[in-house]
């Protein structure tokens, strides 16, 4: 019982391993749980248990992901590891496993490979804010100069995608040696150094409740004698009776005052992130607000029609399209609580997009929707999901 209590006093941070196939992501994940369990308690998860990752669904897409946890002196980490490259792409784009930071695993023997580059680019596109590097298999490289060279290459690659390459912590070690209990510099001590790098380089994540208030509108009712009530799940922040909010998206932005906050038919002084609430709006008519808009703290979010996005297109086996799509493709984009039709513009030199591909696209919606960078969405045709995406840049 006491242990449960103790756990919750540590700050919770979400991380994950990224990097090229066979560079040792899963071995490192196992090593982190082993060293963490030995030093701070918790459960050791063996390689095989992590590798047999269960399938889960996120936004209609099946992804294999292994979830493990471990502790350091000051934090409790929830860590995701994916068995296949396609699972990484899907995981990062759907935000199924939101990461406060990532551990880039790169083999010292091979140096950066195509997926190393692709995962760094994806991390940049989908808004993974911090990266720490583990240079794995350091026992396979005798030449110190070669290690320096690989480290330099990794730093250059990070800088190329706007991560602070020169200031990123790079820990050299061998995940396998650490798993075997090796106490030399590249064994267990390397894992301890990596854990310390996570603690110091990844800042404390901002909690949803500390961000400005935002609630997507799910339903609108008119209550006679009281006015218009808007219901939804508060995404972030806190709302109090008397607060001014903006109604953003679909039509021109307007302002109103919240005159009541209800949960489970009880009146409250305030609602906060995670609450399913009904907000009573002063002087707002039933037809002036609709599903798909958001209520937000004034000035914190704007509506946009055009944006760039990183998208993953479902394969036929996943229940997606059976045929490719071309420039000018117009599906529906499901953002927060509504479908909005939009037109897809492919990058120069890309003729078509096949089911199973991931690609950067530009989208023009028919109506403006409240969004910012990092906003997740599903791509749908006739009510079925055919893809998933994340806004990487707002244009207009």
From Swiss-Prot:
Domain tr-type G positions: 10-206
Class of this enzyme: hydrolase
GO cellular component: cytosol
Region described as G1: spans on this chain: 19-26
Highest rank taxon of the organism: Bacteria
Binding site for Mg(2+): 26
Keywords from the UniProt entry: Cytoplasm, Elongation factor, GTP-binding, Hydrolase, Magnesium, Metal-binding, Nucleotide-binding, Protein biosynthesis
GO terms of molecular function: GTP binding; GTPase activity; guanosine tetraphosphate binding; translation elongation factor activity
Reaction catalyzed: GTP + H2O = GDP + phosphate + H(+)
UniProt-annotated location(s): Cytoplasm
InterPro entries the UniProt entry points to: EF-Tu_GTP-bd, EF-Tu_GTPase, EFTu-like_2, EFTU_2, G_TR_CS, P-loop_NTPase, Small_GTP-bd, T_Tr_GTP-bd_dom
Broad class of where this protein is predominantly found: cytoplasm
A Pfam family: GTP_EFTU
Residue ranges of the region described as G5: 174-176
Disulphide connectivity of cysteines: none
Ranges for region G4: 136-139
Region (G2): 60-64
Binding site for GTP: 19-26, 81-85, 136-139
Region (G3): 81-84
NCBIfam families cross-referenced by the UniProt entry: EF-Tu, PRK00049.1, PRK12735.1, PRK12736.1, small_GTP
Job of this protein: GTP hydrolase that promotes the GTP-dependent binding of aminoacyl-tRNA to the A-site of ribosomes during protein biosynthesis.
Subunit-level organization: Monomer.
Family indicated by similarity: Belongs to the TRAFAC class translation factor GTPase superfamily. Classic translation factor GTPase family. EF-Tu/EF-1A subfamily.
Stored PANTHER family: ELONGATION FACTOR TU, MITOCHONDRIAL, ELONGATION FACTOR TU-RELATED
HAMAP family the UniProt entry points to: EF_Tu_B (MF_00118_B)
Protein name stated in the entry: Elongation factor Tu
Gene: tufA
């Amino acid at each position: 019982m006491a242990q449960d209590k103790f756990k919750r006093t540590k700050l919770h941070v979400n991380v994950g391993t990224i990097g090229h196939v066979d560079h040792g992501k899963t071995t490192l994940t196992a090593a982190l749980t082993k060293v963490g369990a030995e030093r701070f308690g918790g459960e050791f998860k063996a390689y095989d248990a992590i590798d047999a990752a269960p399938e889960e669904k996120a936004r209609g897409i099946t992804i294999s992901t292994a979830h493990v946890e471990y502790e350091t002196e000051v934090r409790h980490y929830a860590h995701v590891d994916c068995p296949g490259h396609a699972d990484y792409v899907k995981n990062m784009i759907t935000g199924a496993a939101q990461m406060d930071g990532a551990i880039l695993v790169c083999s010292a023997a091979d140096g950066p490979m195509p997926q190393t580059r692709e995962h760094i680019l994806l991390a940049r596109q989908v808004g993974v804010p911090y990266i720490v590097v583990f240079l794995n298999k350091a026992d396979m490289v005798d030449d110190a100069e070669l290690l320096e060279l690989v480290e330099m290459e990794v730093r250059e690659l990070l800088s190329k995608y706007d991560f602070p390459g020169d200031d990123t912590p790079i820990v050299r070690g061998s995940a396998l040696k650490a798993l075997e209990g090796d106490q030399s510099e590249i064994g267990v001590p390397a894992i301890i150094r990596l854990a310390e790098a996570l603690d110091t380089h990844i800042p404390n994540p901002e909690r949803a409740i500390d961000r400005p208030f935002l609630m997507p509108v799910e339903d609108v009712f008119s209550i006679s004698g009281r006015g218009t009530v808007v219901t939804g799940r508060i995404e972030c922040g806190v709302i109090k009776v008397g607060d001014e909010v903006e109604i953003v998206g679909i039509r021109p932005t307007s302002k109103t005052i919240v005159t009541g906050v209800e949960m489970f038919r009880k009146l409250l002084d305030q609602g906060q992130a995670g609450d399913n609430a009904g907000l009573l709006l002063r002087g707002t008519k039933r037809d002036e607000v609709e599903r798909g808009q958001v209520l937000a703290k004034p000035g914190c979010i704007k509506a946009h029609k055009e944006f760039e996005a990183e998208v993953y297109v479902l394969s036929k086996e996943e229940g997606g399209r059976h045929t490719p799509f071309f420039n000018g493709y117009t599906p529906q984009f499901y953002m927060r609580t509504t479908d909005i039709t939009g037109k897809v513009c492919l990058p120069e030199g890309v003729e078509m997009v096949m089911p199973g591909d991931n690609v950067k696209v530009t989208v023009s919606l028919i109506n403006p929707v409240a969004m910012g960078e990092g906003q997740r969405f599903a791509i749908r045709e006739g009510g079925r999901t055919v893809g998933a995406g994340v806004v990487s840049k707002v244009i207009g």
